Amino acid sequence: MIPPNINVLIRSICINLVTSLPLNFAYIFIHFAVNALREIKRSLIDPMRNLSNWAKGDPCNSNWTGIICFGRSHNDGHFHVRELQLMRLNLSGELAPEVGQLLYLEILDVMWNNLTGRIPLEIGRISSLKLLLLNGNKFTGSLPPELGNLQNLNRLQVDENNITGSVPFSFGNLRSIKHLHLNNNTISGEIPVELSKLPKLVHMILDNNNLTGTLPLELAQLPSLTILQLDNNNFEGSTIPEAYGHFSRLVKLSLRNCGLQGSIPDLSRIENLSYLDLSWNHLTGTIPESKLSDNMTTIELSYNHLTGSIPQSFSDLNSLQLLSLENNSLSGSVPTEIWQDKSFENNKLQVYDLNNNFSDATGNLRTPDNVTLYLRGNPICKSTSIPMVTQFFEYICGEKKQTSTNSNTPCSNVSCPFENVKVSPGICLCTAPLSIDYRLKSPSFFFFTPYIERQFREYITSSLQLETHQLAIDRLVDENRLRPRMYLKLVPKGRITFNKSEVIRIRDRFMSWSFNKTDFFGPYELLDFPLQGPYADLLAQTSGIRTIVWMMIVAGSVVAATVLSVTATLLYVRKRRENSHTLTKKRVFRTISREIKGVKKFSFVELSDATNGFDSSTLIGRGSYGKVYKGILSNKTEVAIKRGEETSLQSEKEFLNEIDLLSRLHHRNLVSLIGYSSDIGEQMLVYEYMPNGNVRDWLSANAADTLSFSMRSHVALGSAKGILYLHTEANPPVIHRDIKTSNILLDCQLHAKVADFGLSRLAPAFGEGDGEPAHVSTVVRGTPGYLDPEYFMTQQLTVRSDVYSFGVVLLELLTGMHPFFEGTHIIREVRTANECGTVLSVADSRMGQCSPDKVKKLAELALWCCEDRPETRPPMSKVVKELEGICQSVREPEMFSETTKLLCSKTSPSSSSVPSPLSLLPGSNLDSGFFHAVKPR
């Protein structure tokens, strides 16, 4: 029994700890930021009461809608608003100037509301701002020149507003800007030459304004520009500068309906050009004969005054999908060899719009299903003597017609609590669909042929992992011959509603532009993904500091209180047990009678001799089990000896079972058990020695050498194979429960091996459905930062908990960051970058050269592993398959040869450390491709 005085002490400690929590959190937030948010709310009209929870508490700890915070404990100990996410909340009113007081804000997103008034110039004070997303509102006035002060701004979207005035010269100071979207406003004046000084600018999208003057030839100096889109402006009388043929990285050049005159310059030197739209201008002369880029997919030159014939070089453009020359003054014959050339792939979609041009046609006009040909207005369409014209008259000589959609033949008005959706002719479903509004790649495919529609359905559903009957094309709208606007509806399979994880997965696919790669239908622009009806509250659950973070804070406090309680109790009982306990650790276990096959039993003396009496100079680590020593056996074999501490000692039976299990686990990517010792009350495990330490040390900023992307990919694959073995081939299956970079060790050849697994993590029997072990209820164990949130909250452990932890490991390999980084979590950092299309910015610059596509694939795989819901994470078998694909074209480093032979042959007992192979060999040519080196955030 605990004496009363100790009881009082325990209660006092716990009460003080718990009652201090609200006080602490009340003062960790800067009050002027709270006042700024309340002023923002006061200036907004919120008919749906989405911001009703902004009335009490503080933004970070009370889950204010749209507020995401991060800590700055390393700096000032406060929480700060990092993101203000108010997209599509049906808000009106004005954006208050107090928004400029949120000095730590990185993302300001008020897209697709009905906000009016001027854009606050005070936003220019937020030096940390990276994303400024104001598009889809009714802002008026001019663009504040103060926005040019935002040196860290990555993306500026002010499109779809009522902005007037000119583009400020100060925008030339946005040294970090990559995306400048000012389209669909009433901006006037000339394009400032200063915009040619933006070194990172990728997209300059200024279409649908009232811009005038000439096209600045200096824009061709932009080193990173991939899209220049200036359609529907008033550059009346201006010509296309010859310098535009020297863009270094341009992919899309779109100058539709700009009043341009003169001839088309030579664009053949733009190596990556794939999309060219110069239609609806006053261009004259002939089409240049020089061959355009092999990447060319779209050539739109319709409605000009071009003469001459179609260049023969067009027949060599094997990637061409659209050639539109409608309404010019071209002469000669219809060059049927363009679509009849055998170099074209049979499944490539191709559209040739040659209306109102030619005087004659030669060759066979029969076209395969994947080719659409328009010849209306040509003399050939008046002929009655040429076969095949009659057979395909609707497509060749008729008017272009829009494909019928589901909305043309609506479902009957049957009673349905949600919506009757027509999924195929004659079939309507009562369901709660997901509605998507987005624009397709401009401007080719507003007129769907049946073949193109089939391909489109396959493209969408395969990218979303749905079946084709789950997609309904609701409407297709022509926006002034601009980009076709598509309204889609997705219906659940076999149910009325999608479950939460499916909704989040599908929405993330659209919002992160992560569809299967295609140049035909993409890239696209997401306009709306409304979550209505049964899905209305899904996003509200993710506002503020994530619930899991708050729960971990509270749980940590409770654990701390428990520890204090136990400590106080132990202080009391320790004295009473001190004398009787002196022999506990050194009591002699009775001899283990059963021999364990495959491992050696060592005496205490042997292991003591191997470590010079467990001298501190041989200590190489410490874990939950105890200290780890490097030892050298009598036969010169180097080993790692894990010496259990008193609190880790098990019963004889438990220890024997542990050894029996570990002795049966054999895989090249698991650290091998060599033997054990149970002499004089000690319990020790003897493992193979890993001379290159753990992965965490290699990723450390203080590491003398580092791992290339090739090495990291193979480390990831190797460790994944080890974990897969534990999950599916070990008998019984084993759930690791503490996967982290410090538990992935590297041998002398830098091959990855998973360590620190054992009996305490045995998985239950396999489930009936998915071939994986079912869950087991257990006390939560693991390392903060790697801990599966579902496991933390429910205490139900599954193999998908290991998948989550491994996803964090992948993110560490990719970025070099620790899981908790400057008050935020690595998952959040990479997910944000991935959604913004800037995942390369968080990649570890020390990896050297590597393929951007491989980096993106690794990031997407890691984020998939880190999904909140276990059922949405991939099994380890899928993870291994994906990593094999990434590693397939990434050659295993050549340094695994002569240098590692030297390292692996080292057996000198006097050597306490082994030189890194990276210090002996250069690692600059291990991978193909590259990305610009950016230091990890």
Swiss-Prot record:
Top EC class for this record: transferase
Family: Belongs to the protein kinase superfamily. Ser/Thr protein kinase family.
Topology feature Cytoplasmic, residues: 569-937
Glycosylation sites: 50, 63, 90, 114, 162, 184, 210, 272, 295, 327, 357, 370, 413, 499, 516
Subcellular localization: Cell membrane
Alphabetic keyword roster: ATP-binding, Cell membrane, Glycoprotein, Kinase, Leucine-rich repeat, Membrane, Nucleotide-binding, Receptor, Repeat, Serine/threonine-protein kinase, Signal, Transferase, Transmembrane, Transmembrane helix
Chain ranges of the Protein kinase domain: 614-886
Annotated GO CC locations: plasma membrane
Claim: Metal-binding is one of the keywords in the record: no
Binding residues for ATP: I620, G621, R622, G623, S624, Y625, G626, K627, V628, K642
Membrane topology (UniProt): Single-pass membrane protein
Enzyme Commission number: 2.7.11.1
Catalytic activities: L-seryl-[protein] + ATP = O-phospho-L-seryl-[protein] + ADP + H(+); L-threonyl-[protein] + ATP = O-phospho-L-threonyl-[protein] + ADP + H(+)
The organism's taxonomic lineage, starting at the top: Eukaryota, Viridiplantae, Streptophyta, Embryophyta, Tracheophyta
Transmembrane segments: 548-568
Main location: membrane
Catalytic residue positions: D738 (proton acceptor)
Protein name per Swiss-Prot or TrEMBL: Putative leucine-rich repeat receptor-like serine/threonine-protein kinase At3g53590
One function term, GO molecular function aspect: ATP binding
LRR repeats: 102-126, 127-150, 152-173, 174-198, 200-222, 223-249, 251-270, 271-294, 296-316, 317-341, 343-360
PANTHER family xrefs: PROTEIN KINASE DOMAIN-CONTAINING PROTEIN, RECEPTOR-LIKE PROTEIN 55
Side Extracellular, residues: 21-547
Signal peptide span: 1-20
